[in-house]
Amino acid sequence: MINYQREYNLKEISYAKNDAICKFYIETTSIDLIKNIIKEGGYLFIGNTSKILFCFKYKEIKIIKFISKEMKIYKNLIVVDSGMSLSKLGNICNNNGISGFEKLMTIPGLLGGSIFNNASFLDQCISDNLLYLLIIDKQGNFRIIKKEEIELNYRKINIKILDEGYFIYKAIFKVKRKSFNELLKNKLLAINYRIKNQPQIHSLGSTFKNLSNIKVYQLIDKYVNFTEYNGYSICQTHKNFIELRKDLDILNLVKLIERIQEVLYNNIGLFIETEIKIIY
């Protein structure tokens, strides 16, 4: 399946809903097409954009979304396409008595991006039960990568034997069993935690990556003495969240992020990375 569009406005599919036109937008289930695109260059793979800001008016780039959602469950293995949402993956696993995704399923992302960002929530991490990744490298070769070949970091992975620009199209996980009641309990725990601790606003979730010993919202609360920039506001109930506004220039959101980074750097001497990927 291929959906191919020229001069496409990404506000139709992006969380931020701002005007950003790319030269080509392609949704596909075809691995062969993706292989050819990679060999041509000039591409960007996206998921559901829950962690992306498109900060351009027009860009000559191919934006690719892999939408294949096949999943097979074997006795000891799960094989899943990277285009499947964590929500759907979690529901299928819960219904089959498989643990490892019942808390992660509350993250509004696709599997591929979640692996690339080594997503975690509470005590579950997407890489916990990971065994292999099936990828296409930058040269267009199909590769199988063992978990042991992956450097797992906070909110990112690094496959040292590969150049950047590879594409993850499948993941293989080991099966870990739990009872239906345990899975339901964990799922409800995650949902209730989000309701209680995270603001119910239109946002891209946490703006900044936490440090190993302190939460960024605590640093913002301590050192940042402003609350908004040209209409964009720091959420006062959780200061690592910024509310999205369709009626405002997205570049002013970026400027607010940069101002926060500057203040924190001047006070603690560290540059705080964003969880959000900003595409110029």
Name every feature range the model reports, one short phrase each.
Residues M1-N117:
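Anion-binding (especially nucleotide phosphate/pyrophosphate-binding) glycine-rich loop
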Residues I21, D128, Y166-I168:
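A general secondary-structure signal for short beta-strands and their flanking turns/coil
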Residues K39, I46-N48, N129, H202, ...:
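Short, basic and Ser/Thr-rich N-terminal targeting/leader segments
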Residues I52, E102-M105, N118-C125, L133, ...:
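A generic local secondary-structure boundary/capping motif
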Residues E70-K72, L131-D137:
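Short polybasic amphipathic segments
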Residues G112-I126, R143, V175:
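Core subunits and conserved enzymes of cellular information-processing
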Residues I136, F142-E258, E262, N266-Y280:
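Phosphate/pyrophosphate- and phosphate-bearing ligand-binding catalytic cores of soluble enzymes
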